Swiss-Prot record:
Subcellular location: Cytoplasm
Name of the featured protein: D-aminoacyl-tRNA deacylase
Domain of life per record: Bacteria
Keyword Acyltransferase part of the UniProt annotation: no
Family: Belongs to the DTD family.
Gene Ontology molecular function, alphabetical: D-tyrosyl-tRNA(Tyr) deacylase activity; Gly-tRNA(Ala) deacylase activity; Ser(Gly)-tRNA(Ala) hydrolase activity; tRNA binding
One protein family per Pfam: Tyr_Deacylase
UniProt EC number: 3.1.1.96
Job of this protein: An aminoacyl-tRNA editing enzyme that deacylates mischarged D-aminoacyl-tRNAs. Also deacylates mischarged glycyl-tRNA(Ala), protecting cells against glycine mischarging by AlaRS. Acts via tRNA-based rather than protein-based catalysis; rejects L-amino acids rather than detecting D-amino acids in the active site. By recycling D-aminoacyl-tRNA to D-amino acids and free tRNA molecules, this enzyme counteracts the toxicity associated with the formation of D-aminoacyl-tRNA entities in vivo and helps enforce protein L-homochirality.
Gene Ontology CC terms, in alphabetical order: cytoplasm
One biological process term in Gene Ontology: D-amino acid catabolic process
Gly-cisPro motif, important for rejection of L-amino acids (motif): residue ranges: 136-137
Amino acid sequence: MKIVIQRVMKASLTVNGKSRASINQGLVLLVGIGPDDVQEDLTYAVRKITNMRIFSDEEGKMNLSVRDIKGEVLSVSQFTLFANTKKGNRPAFTGAAQADLASYLYDQFNQELAQFVPVQTGIFGSDMQVSLTNDGPVTILLDTKNKE
């Protein structure tokens, strides 16, 4: 899994011009599923995301997690995180998981995440518009295949 984690003040998502989801302070997650991803990747990612101390405490130090601040999460499926740009000018997305596996694992990821924080989602495979107000900005890339 490759996940872009963005700390936000607020975010919203629309599909086909209709509002689908919105959150206040919390995290926007752009979630890419790879062909070799398994349940252990989901569990690892959920643990990291929900406990990552990237929100400021009363002294201005990044010392609080999204759980600590009672924040929310907007989770957006993002197969383009597996783009291969080595050849030519058009990215290839063959490094992403097939849609059926990716959809299943994305749903499982969101269900597991929702055990710890409120989660809003987009619609898997849809063309979506995401609006957000970055906070910091703080943007982190989590790759479950690179745990060292």
